[in-house]
Design a protein with these regions (language model features):
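Active-site groove signature of glycoside hydrolases
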Residues: 105-130
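Alpha-helix-loop-beta-strand connector modules within alpha/beta enzyme cores
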Residues: 63-81, 137-150
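Short, acidic/polar
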Residues: 29-42, 92-107, 162-170, 277
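Beta/alpha (TIM)-barrel catalytic core signal, keyed to glycine-rich beta->alpha loops juxtaposed to Asp/Glu
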Residues: 121-331
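Conserved, mostly hydrophobic/aromatic
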Residues: 6, 18, 50, 65, ...
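N-terminal binding-site loop/beta-alpha segment at the start of enzyme catalytic domains
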Residues: 1-77
Length: 332
């Protein structure tokens, strides 16, 4: 398993991380024996980053991950969790953040995590359940730093969802160590310019900003919430199709566009669409680790097999770029 140094943290993190989210659902709603089997297999092949959040199953993901790690006692496991601050707590961010992490640590059975990510979307002016860049830098950061000084988290992170200008501002402030970034075959604008008229949010080459600031990148929505699996079928324990992040305005449109990328399979570049999506995500050097949702140990094995084949060859990336140009001019 390839490892990459995660930004300025100097942590050697496996390029494939273990996602404990609610979309795939294994660590939220899976059978305990399947959870243990998948985590044990991940550790066996050298996966060392585990990503969870209190929002995943209202704490179930953290609890289940904590149980399994306590049983398996890995020599090295980096754990990241998150806090989503509700609007009613925007007037007490310091306390809300501290209380959330304390709850997470209790569920995980740990005295600290390696990365503590803000889960809220970040916008220029805030509003609703989003935080403004100003709120993040002036209120969230000091609260996070207090927890860092107390030893409850080693590093600070954001979820890079929201308005592009605000995300650039927060990354450029050089105070966060990690950013979870949506990056997939339907929207690669974190890495490259979007063609004019392309129907997706333009992340404005966010990777240029993370690399300059020494921010490690966790790739999320690698399979676009399931759209890039190439099938409408979802495992019984998986979540319903989630709202897209950064790509189309609805999941059905993402599904339709994903089907138009199938020439990658038919022309022999890859064995399957999810393989293409997974290998695409690790093809950029700014990527520190990627998270692929899973409902079963078998789905984990499929993601693992794809990563072990390595990044997509340049010919496949060129073919993908040509296919994606077909989306230009369509409504988002």
């Amino acid at each position: 398993m390839e490892t990459r140094i995660f930004g300025r943290t100097e942590m050697p993190i496996s390029i494939l991380g273990f996602g404990c989210g609610a979309v795939g659902g294994l660590m939220v709603r899976g059978a305990p024996q399947d959870q243990e089997r998948a985590v044990a297999r991940a550790l066996e092949v050298g996966i060392n980053y585990f990503d969870t959040a209190v929002q995943y199953g209202h704490g179930a993901s953290e609890t289940n991950l904590g149980i399994v790690l306590a049983k398996l006692k890995p020599a090295q496991a980096f754990v990241g969790t998150k806090v989503r601050i509700p609007p009613e707590d925007f007037s007490r961010i310091d306390t809300a953040v501290a209380d959330s992490l304390d709850g997470s640590l209790q569920r995980l059975g740990m005295d600290h995590v390696d990365i503590f990510h803000l889960h809220n979307a970040i916008t220029v002016n805030g509003g609703g359940d989003t935080l403004s860049a100003k709120q993040v830098l002036e209120q969230v950061v000091p609260a996070f730093q207090k927890l860092q000084k107390s030893g409850k988290t080693r590093f600070l992170g954001i979820t890079a969802v929201g308005e592009t200008a605000a995300l650039h501002q927060v990354v450029d402030a050089n105070v966060f160590d990690s950013a979870q970034v949506s990056y997939n075959m339907l929207n690669a604008s974190a890495a490259q310019p979007l063609p004019a008229g392309y129907p997706a949010q333009d992340y404005g080459r966010l990777f240029d900003h993370t690399q300059k600031a020494g921010v490690g990148v966790v790739g999320i929505r690698v399979l676009a919430g399931g759209a890039l699996t190439g099938t409408a079928e979802r495992h019984p324990i998986a979540s319903p199709p989630p709202a897209p992040i950064g790509s189309a305005l609805n999941y059905e449109t993402d599904m339709e566009r994903a089907q138009r990328l199938m020439p990658l399979v038919r022309e022999g570049f890859v064995g399957s669409l999810p393989e293409a999506a997974t290998r695409f995500a690790i093809s950029h050097p700014a990527m520190g680790t990627i998270l692929v949702g899973m409902a079963t140990p078998d789905e984990f094995e499929a993601g693992l097999a794809a990563v072990l084949k390595g990044p997509l060859p340049q010919a496949a990336l060129n073919r993908l770029a040509t296919l994606a140009k077909g989306f230009v001019g369509e409504g988002r």
